[in-house]
Design a protein with these regions (language model features):
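A residue-level marker of the well-folded mature domains of exported/periplasmic proteins
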Residues: 1-165
Length: 165
């Protein structure tokens, strides 16, 4: 599209490609929110087992960076807690995320978080009576009894700046 419309500026949220002319990408510092959500998880686990459903492995730096920041947050308040990661290799796959969540819950994880896009890790956490930390949407509406917090984006400051500059 950018090549077809050279006088229009395109910007892709959470992307990684650019043409150096009229197409760029932008991203936030998700590790900051991951660190804070790790603190929340570390303060709320009773059994010191925290489940993390991850969309990608180390081939995508965003995900392991988020896991590391989350782990540092957990460790800062609860050095005895362990984080168990299950990788789906997909950003959005209901079946894989459900199975990964079930595996972690069956291991005894009493706090669940995610870096993937279906609500399954959170809805299953609520069904099992454990806490959850959502991602990319406010899960407090869908899982009001279990949601501790959610890592979500508010792009309004970027959009305002991009439009006016």
């Amino acid at each position: 599209m950018a090549e077809k419309y050279p006088d229009v500026y395109f910007s892709h949220g959470t992307g990684y490609m650019s043409n150096g002319k009229n197409f760029n990408n932008y991203f936030g510092r998700s590790y900051q929110a991951r660190y804070l959500s790790g603190i929340v998880a570390g303060m709320n686990t009773k059994d010191n087992k925290i489940g993390y459903v991850a969309a990608q492995d180390s081939s995508n730096s965003e995900v392991p960076g988020g896991i590391a920041a989350f782990a540092i947050g957990v460790e800062s308040v609860n050095p005895k807690a362990k984080i168990y990661v299950d990788v789906t290799n997909s950003w959005y796959d209901e079946k894989k995320e459900k199975k990964a969540s079930e595996r972690l819950l069956n291991m005894g994880c009493d706090v669940m978080t995610q870096h993937c896009d279906t609500p399954y890790p959170q809805t299953l956490a609520q069904e099992k009576g454990v806490y959850g930390i959502g991602y990319n949407s406010d899960m407090s509406k869908e899982t009001p009894d279990s949601c501790l917090t959610s890592v979500i984006w508010n792009w309004s400051a970027y959009y305002t700046s991009a439009v006016y500059h």
